[in-house]
Amino acid sequence: MKRYVFMLSDGTGITAETLGNSLITQFENIQFEKITIPYIDSTHRAESVVLRINQCFSEQGTKPLVFMTLVDPEIRQAIKKAHACVFDLFSIFIGPLENELEEKSSYTVGRTHGVANVKSYSHRIEAIDFALSHDDGIKTRGYDKADIILIGVSRCGKTPSCLYMALQYGILAANYPFTEEDLVGFRLPDVLRPYKQKLFGLTIDAQRLQQIRSERRPNSKYASAEQCRLEVTEVEAMYQRENIPYINSTKYSIEEISTKVLAIAGLQRKI
């Protein structure tokens, strides 16, 4: 079975996508054709979107699902005229909030992802710059400023996790990869020892690590099953010996890895 899913927003569409995807992934036997339409900022544009939704209804014979985060009441009403099952994610929550807070919403578009909060925006940029300049052990001098330092073998998810934490949470995240040389008589590298309280380890199943590395450098010692097993075994033993917290990243998305790391490390959002 196939169903069309529209994610509609008067901003970037990130919130509608996030909430919509979280819900539809619970239905594994249905194939979803996802369409995101951001910046619906007028009733004229909303009407053109309605035509597109109705066309999908005519072609498929089933109502498209519509997840929308639209602030303007007139634009929301225009979308609700579509032949679709509409989930108005804004009004679901804003009414009860107005009642509880005893204050009317300002109905301002773009509050979530805008740059109105200059301090927050500047901190996000600083965090991204920090993650990029302290990626892959390139620069260790700034580790004293880091909120967290991810460590682990090559290709276990350190870099994307650091970038995600920087972008979404404003966390100053560095990462350090263990090389083949580090694994000889393996112990915690001296450069990391002064920052031991900031260290958080990632590990990964050896079979999955081999698959990832084979895509990058096929038929190499680096990607061999034996090498992957050795590195994973040694690094996990070191984590336990040094009492460094760690998680296995094999079955988790970058978003899940990042949130688990922050929760275990006790770090809070900065933006």
Curated annotation (Swiss-Prot):
It comes from the Bacteria. One of its GO terms (molecular function) is ATP binding. It holds the Pfam family Kinase-PPPase. Transmembrane segments: none annotated. Its EC number is 2.7.11.33, 2.7.4.28. Bifunctional serine/threonine kinase and phosphorylase involved in the regulation of the phosphoenolpyruvate synthase (PEPS) by catalyzing its phosphorylation/dephosphorylation. This is Putative phosphoenolpyruvate synthase regulatory protein. It comes from Legionella pneumophila (strain Lens).
